[in-house]
Amino acid sequence: MIQDIYPMKLDNAFQMKEPDADSRILAFRDRTVYLKNEGEITFLKYHVWVEYCKTHHKKVPGLVYLFSVDDISFYLTELYEDVEIPGFMYHKLFAVRSMKPKERVFAATTAWHLYVWYRDNQFCGRCAHPLVHSRTERMLQCPVCNNMVFPKIAPAVIIGLTNNDQIMMTKYAGREYKRYALIAGFTEIGETAEETVHREVMEEVGLKVKNIRYYKSQPWGFDSNLLMGFFCDLAEEGEIRLEEEELDRKSTRLNSSHMSESRMP
């Protein structure tokens, strides 16, 4: 799972701290992240960024502390439009998923989660005044009406629907991700995670389920989610009826679950 980076550990505690020379700098543009990928991810170091700015007679932009991975601190900033640092470029987040090492993939996706929150919450949704960063916790606050805005975390489920030795595999229709995937979806207002499992399976493939069992969860910063994994069994045989705006009819089916991981579609 994406958070499995042991023996390293992500420390997400809020801090007001200054960067050191080896702190890592993360910047995003659309759904891309600025890094070097030569066999493994290399993030921009703070001292390299400072030297670049000095050499090009530019002011070092402001930084926001994000988190640490072991003893390395990560910061968010905005790069200049014309920045050119040898080996570095903007990479699509979709491509980062398959890069190495795992702890840097996890760092990039978690940083993206926070970046989207900061980007989308510059003004108060109640009175429209600019929000300011709290100095005591990870929170944005309106100085006029005192509205407080915390990071967005959207609960969602991912479902292993089984029938004897088979498991339901789907393919999304018209999306960048082309590989097989389990049924998944967001939890709605007034709904438990277990009720989400029932609803999502019915909506996406038209089947009833039983014996819902919680498995594990994982943070999914790509879409600001907390993904909760469940297994469940097919309650009764029935025709698969696809939500065709979401799923590819030709590719969604029950597949053998006793296949080795390397043979799974």
Predicted features along the sequence, with ranges:
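C-terminal hydrophobic structural anchor segments
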Residues: 223-251
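Single conserved hydrophobic/aromatic residue that forms the stacking wall/gate
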Residues: 254-265
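N-terminal strand-loop-strand
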Residues: 34, 139-182, 186, 208-209, ...
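Acidic pyrophosphate-coordinating catalytic loop
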Residues: 147, 218-227
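The catalytic Nudix box helix
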Residues: 181-216, 230, 234-236
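N-terminal alpha-helical interaction blocks
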Residues: 1-101
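Cys/His-rich short segments
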Residues: 110-160
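A gly/proline- and charged-residue-enriched helix-loop-helix capping module
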Residues: 84-126
